Each structure stands twice: as structure tokens, then as C-alpha cells.
């Protein structure tokens, strides 16, 4: 049989061969395209926040039957805030793991105005990096080796909340996507005893997200350093009452009130109290308000701290690993009626220089000139 068309006469045998050839090659092309699609990507996108682009680390979704991280958004113009983390959770699809507004709303709020004094909007969303101290610090009674760090009367969560990174670079391969930033912080506008260089890395890999912060004393005087992270983790089901938190902590730091949340200098055991976060089943959040520092932490043989957030209603679990031996406290913040909990592993207790501590070690690391210290946390997903 012959077919006649615009290209002339074609034999049935030739036509069959052409069709067979097309059929055999097409799957190869599709397979090749699939192989060429990168497992991890990095992009720098708008809007500009803090005059720098947003960095987005992304991972290709591989197995929808398992929980896995999908993307991370970072704000190098605002102290390398880990603004959003997304993950695929079976039954829920891709969800936000951090309590954050849209990037456009964040840009409007992070404007240096009255509500953003000292970068305060940065610790209201996402996950702010806290340096050179975590938690709260009074200005007046602050005393370190007879010196007065020149903070405000009441400073929150360090001095880099509104800082733009001095330099940023990114990298990707088949196993991870990462961003690296450096901040030449100096003496924080004459508010700290010596000069500091900060190196911050954020890495999205096959099974985890990791954050590392290294502080180096590049000045001529010894200085104290406290580092922390302030992520607002969502409760995906929205049912806060049944969600549970497990922290291997034996103690709770008492505060004078929940307005200023300054410590009294007293520490009490959590066993048998409404604040026992150490029980194996976890503390059920219920209707309880939390804004408390937990101490007396138990760690594994490698000095790692493991915290668990469990939302059984969503079949969602999150391991929050503190991988720095200098992490001495965990701040938990979860207002009653809100479907999130801030879980903040940190070096130091609140108001670490206060006289209420009466000489107690409050977790600040002392760095001599040229010395450095590294803070690290790692997130892993699991099905409870």
C-alpha cells in the first residue's frame, strides 16, 4: 500500500518504520529530560527586603508517600531570617512550616518605622537569627566583667535583626542547596565590648534543613556571645489543644511576670508541674500559655539536643535538633488560642548579665580575640 501526500509517495513499510522510530525515541527523550531536571535549585527573587533579594532554596519532590522538605526562603537583608520553610506532608500536600505573612506584607512591615525599631518586626515572623545575645536584655543593670554593654533599656533578640549581610553566595549539587552569608558586625555600633564577624549558612538536603551561625571575635578585647534562633512553627492541623511538645529539660526559669518576661533568678524543677515538657508523651499544649525558658537540658553522647513537635491530628512530626554543645536553654512561646509555637534553642538565659543571677553561669560564651564559636540546629520530619 502507498500513501500520497504533499511530500510525495511513501510506502507503507517506510511509514511504519518512521512511526516505529518516533515511538521508540520519544520515551528516551522524556527520560533524558527527567534526568536533566536538577534535584536542587537556588534562585534569588523579588521583592527586595532590606535592599536585598530573597534567596529561595528548592528541592524536587521525590516520593509523595513520605514527608519531605520542599523549599526554604531566606532574607539576607534582614539578618538572614529563615522566613519560610515548606514541606510535603502526606494527606496535606505542600504546607508552610513557619508562621509568616506573604513576602509583600513582610516588606511593608520591615520598613524601619516605629514598629520596626531595631528590626523588631524580624522576630515577629519566620525564624530570626539572634546575635550577640538571645532573648531579652535590660540596658541599665547589664554588667559584664565590670562593663556596661550599651543596649537599649529593654532590647530583644540581639542586634542583627535589621542587618543586611555583607556578602552572600549560594551553591547546589545533586545532594543539597545552600546559601552562605557573612556579616561584618563590628562592635554593633559601639554596643558590644569587641568586634564580631558572623558567618551564617542555611542548607536544604535530602532529609533535613540545617542552620549554622559562627561568631568570631575579630577585635582586640574579650567579649561575651549568645546565639539563638527564633522560628515560629505552625501546627498544621490548626488544633493547638492536641499538639504536643517534648523538650528534654529538667528545669524552668521563673519570671516576674509575662509582660516584660524578665527572670527572677530562680529556677525550679519541672517534674510534677504544669510545665513538664520532659515526659516521653510530651506536654499537651491545651489552653496553656507558654512564654518560658527551660534549662537543665539532657543531651546525647555527642552533645546534641533533641526536641519534638507532634501534631497527631495532621500525622505530622518535627525533630528540632540542637547540634551545639553550648546550647543551654530552650525558650518556648505559644499564646493560648494560636496555632503556632516558637521553639528557640539558645546559648543563654534571658537577661544574662542581670544581678539576679548572683554570679550563676547564664550560658554566654566568652570569646578571646581570634576565637570563634558555632551554633547549629537541624530539622527533620517524621510521621508520629
Q: Predicted regions span which residues?
A:
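Bacterial N-terminal signal peptides that target proteins for export
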Residues: 1-11
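Beta-strand-rich N-terminal accessory domains
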Residues: 27-145, 301-327, 371-382
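Extended, loop-rich substrate-binding clefts of extracytoplasmic carbohydrate-active enzymes
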Residues: 33-61, 143-206
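Acidic, contiguous internal or C-terminal segments within carbohydrate-active enzymes
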Residues: 57-81, 85, 89-91, 183-236
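Short, structured beta-strand/loop micro-motifs enriched in basic residues and often containing a Trp
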Residues: 131-132, 353-359
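Beta-strand-rich interaction surfaces with strong enrichment in secreted/lumenal proteins
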Residues: 199-201, 362-367
Amino acid at each position: 500500500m502507498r500513501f500520497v501526500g504533499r511530500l510525495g509517495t511513501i510506502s507503507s513499510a517506510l511509514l511504519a518504520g518512521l512511526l516505529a522510530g518516533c515511538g521508540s525515541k520519544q520515551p528516551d527523550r522524556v527520560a533524558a529530560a527527567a534526568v536533566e531536571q536538577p534535584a536542587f535549585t537556588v534562585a534569588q527573587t523579588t521583592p527586595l527586603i532590606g535592599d536585598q533579594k530573597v534567596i529561595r532554596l528548592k528541592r524536587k519532590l521525590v516520593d509523595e508517600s513520605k514527608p519531605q522538605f520542599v523549599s526554604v526562603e531566606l532574607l539576607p537583608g534582614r539578618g538572614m531570617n529563615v522566613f519560610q520553610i515548606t514541606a510535603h506532608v502526606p494527606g496535606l500536600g505542600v504546607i508552610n512550616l513557619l508562621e509568616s505573612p506573604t513576602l509583600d506584607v513582610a516588606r511593608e512591615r520591615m520598613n524601619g518605622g516605629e514598629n520596626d525599631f531595631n528590626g523588631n518586626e524580624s522576630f515577629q515572623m519566620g525564624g530570626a537569627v539572634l546575635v550577640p545575645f538571645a532573648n531579652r536584655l535590660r540596658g541599665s543593670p547589664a554588667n559584664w566583667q565590670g562593663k556596661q554593654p550599651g543596649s537599649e533599656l529593654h532590647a530583644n533578640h540581639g542586634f542583627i535583626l535589621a542587618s543586611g549581610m555583607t556578602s552572600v553566595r549560594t551553591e547546589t549539587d545533586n545532594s543539597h542547596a545552600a546559601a552562605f552569608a557573612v556579616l561584618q558586625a563590628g562592635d554593633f555600633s559601639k554596643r558590644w565590648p569587641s568586634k564580631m564577624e558572623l558567618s551564617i549558612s542555611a542548607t536544604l538536603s535530602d532529609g533535613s534543613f540545617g542552620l549554622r551561625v559562627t561568631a568570631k571575635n575579630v577585635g582586640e578585647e574579650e567579649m561575651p556571645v549568645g546565639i539563638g534562633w527564633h522560628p515560629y512553627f505552625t501546627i498544621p492541623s490548626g488544633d493547638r489543644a492536641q499538639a504536643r511538645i517534648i523538650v528534654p529539660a529538667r528545669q524552668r526559669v521563673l519570671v516576674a511576670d509575662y509582660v516584660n518576661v524578665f527572670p527572677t533568678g530562680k529556677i525550679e524543677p519541672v517534674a510534677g508541674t504544669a510545665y513538664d515538657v520532659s515526659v516521653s508523651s510530651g506536654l499537651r499544649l491545651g489552653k496553656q500559655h507558654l512564654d518560658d525558658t527551660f534549662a537543665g537540658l539532657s543531651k546525647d553522647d555527642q552533645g546534641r539536643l533533641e526536641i519534638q513537635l507532634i501534631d497527631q491530628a495532621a500525622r505530622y512530626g518535627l525533630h528540632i535538633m540542637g547540634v551545639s554543645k553550648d546550647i543551654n536553654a530552650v525558650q518556648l512561646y505559644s499564646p493560648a488560642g494560636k496555632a503556632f509555637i516558637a521553639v528557640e534553642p539558645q546559648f543563654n538565659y534571658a537577661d544574662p548579665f542581670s544581678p539576679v543571677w548572683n554570679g550563676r553561669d547564664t550560658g554566654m560564651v566568652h570569646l578571646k580575640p581570634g576565637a570563634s564559636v558555632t551554633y547549629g540546629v537541624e530539622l527533620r520530619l517524621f510521621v508520629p
